[in-house]
């Protein structure tokens, strides 16, 4: 029996040693993935629930580490695929693999590589599932941040509106009070002062008429016939009782009352104007107070928006890392299939060789 071989035996052993070294490197990467997965506790069941309490920094760091390791595994997988592709070219029907020089250790090495890749595929699948849960948790956190952002904006708007309306109402009430006081001063103090002024003017006019009448009237009293040229002297004119009462109660007291009412009117007017100014100033500051009360809500909304962006970034990185892990798992699966094909080819070659040997012995 002649079994063709395109590579020398020494070269085949060299390739097996190289693949063993690469398998050790892949074993180390698989251990790294298992260490990463150990930091993400999960409750495995029909509906797995993420129980991790990683903060944003830890999540970003974990995602970056997973992405870095996934890139390394992807490069190693591509290299392994190329090596196996080159090896598969030697397993065509025209160029059958020669197993006559292979020892049991070489076959065991190929089987160990297949087992190692199977474990790596399992770890990558588990890591991809865990990263998917992390991405879901980050997306859920982003949705909660959106809800809290809306509530903060709504509460700040309500607070600002209530504050502005309340302060405006206080200012309007103060202005209305000032206007009412000014109207009261006009109705009471100014009207009283004007009435007293009319009374004073009437009193003076009546007194002047009475004096003029007494001075110009002829004297018929017999006691004045003998006065001669002094009969019209002021000292000889007798005043009536009304005139004496007017003179005994001078108009100074009435003028004082008028002055008092005038001063009271002016004071009340100034007080009313002050209230109006305070009311207008209060209403003008209501907008500022409303903006200040609303700014707190806007600040809280901005914080929630920042948390939302962080959660979205974390979710995106976790999804990308999960996708890379799934792709690496698929590549590993393809590599395992090729190794299994190699093992199957070896078994077929061994069986064929055994059959030919048995036939030769019988012959």
Swiss-Prot record:
Transmembrane domains' residue ranges: 99-120
UniProt comment concerning the protein's domains: The C-terminal tail is required specifically for Shigella invasiveness, but not for pore formation. The C-terminal tail is responsible for IpaC/SctB-induced actin nucleation.
Domain of life: Bacteria
Family the UniProt entry places it in: Belongs to the SctB/SipC family.
Species this protein is from: Shigella flexneri
UniProt subunit comment: The core secretion machinery of the T3SS is composed of approximately 20 different proteins, including cytoplasmic components, a base, an export apparatus and a needle. This subunit is involved in the formation of a pore, called the translocon, in host membrane. Interacts with IpaB/SctE. Interacts with the molecular chaperone IpgC, which prevents premature association with IpaB/SctE within the cytoplasm of Shigella cells. Does not interact with CDC42 or RAC1 GTPases in vitro.
UniProt entry tagged with the keyword Translocase: no
Stated consequence of mutating residue 362 to M: Retains 66% of invasion activity
Consequence when changing residue 362 to W: Retains 3% of invasion activity
Role description: Component of the type III secretion system (T3SS), also called injectisome, which is used to inject bacterial effector proteins into eukaryotic host cells. IpaB/SctE and IpaC/SctB are inserted into the host membrane where they form a pore and allow the translocation of effector proteins into the cytosol of target cells. Induction and secretion of IpaC/SctB comprise the final step in triggering the induction of full type III secretion. Required for efficient dissemination. Necessary for lysis of the two cellular membranes that surround bacteria in protrusions during cell-to-cell spread. Contribute to actin nucleation in vitro, which may be a necessary step in Shigella invasion.
Keyword Membrane among UniProt keywords: yes
Name of the protein: Type 3 secretion system translocon protein SctB
Subcellular location: Secreted; Host membrane
Any Pfam family the entry gives: IpaC_SipC
Ranges of biased composition (kind: Low complexity): 17-30
Induction: Synthesis of this immunogen is repressed at 30 degrees Celsius and restored at 37 degrees Celsius.
NCBIfam families: IpaC_SipC, T3SS_SctB_pilot
Keywords, ordered alphabetically: Host membrane, Membrane, Plasmid, Secreted, Transmembrane, Transmembrane helix, Virulence
Bilayer topology annotation: Single-pass membrane protein
């Amino acid at each position: 029996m002649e079994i063709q071989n395109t590579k020398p035996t020494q070269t085949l052993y060299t390739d097996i040693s190289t693949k063993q070294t690469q398998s050790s490197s892949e074993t180390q990467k698989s251990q790294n993935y298992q260490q990463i997965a150990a930091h993400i506790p999960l409750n495995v069941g029909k509906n797995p629930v993420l129980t991790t309490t990683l903060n944003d920094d830890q999540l970003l760091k974990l995602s970056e580490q997973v992405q870095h390791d996934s890139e390394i595994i992807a490069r190693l997988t591509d290299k392994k695929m190329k090596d196996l592709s080159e090896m598969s070219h030697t397993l065509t029907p025209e160029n059958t693999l020669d197993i006559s020089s292979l020892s049991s250790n070489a076959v065991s090495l190929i089987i160990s590589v297949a087992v190692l890749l199977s474990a790596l595929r399992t770890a990558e699948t588990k890591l991809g599932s865990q990263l998917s849960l992390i991405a879901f948790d980050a997306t859920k956190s982003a949705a909660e941040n959106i809800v809290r952002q809306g509530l903060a904006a709504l509460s700040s708007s309500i607070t600002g509106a209530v504050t502005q309306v309340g302060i405006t109402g206080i200012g309007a009430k103060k202005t209305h009070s000032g206007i009412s006081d000014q109207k009261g001063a006009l109705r009471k103090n100014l009207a009283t002062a004007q009435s007293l002024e009319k009374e004073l003017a009437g009193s003076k006019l009546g007194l002047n008429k009475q004096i003029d009448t007494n001075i110009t009237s002829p004297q018929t009293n017999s006691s004045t016939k003998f006065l001669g040229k002094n009969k019209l002297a002021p000292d000889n004119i007798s005043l009536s009782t009304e005139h004496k009462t007017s003179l005994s109660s001078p108009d100074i007291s009435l003028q004082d009352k008028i002055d008092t009412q005038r001063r009271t009117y002016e004071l009340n007017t100034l007080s009313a104007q002050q209230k109006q100014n305070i009311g207008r100033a209060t209403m003008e500051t209501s907008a500022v107070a409303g903006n200040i009360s609303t700014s707190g809500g806007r600040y809280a909304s901005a914080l929630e928006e920042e948390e939302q962006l962080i959660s979205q970034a974390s979710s995106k990185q976790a999804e990308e890392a999960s996708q890379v892990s799934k792709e690496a798992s698929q590549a590993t699966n393809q590599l395992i299939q090729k190794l299994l094909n190699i093992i199957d080819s070896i078994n077929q070659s061994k069986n064929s060789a055994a059959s030919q040997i048995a036939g030769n012995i019988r012959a």
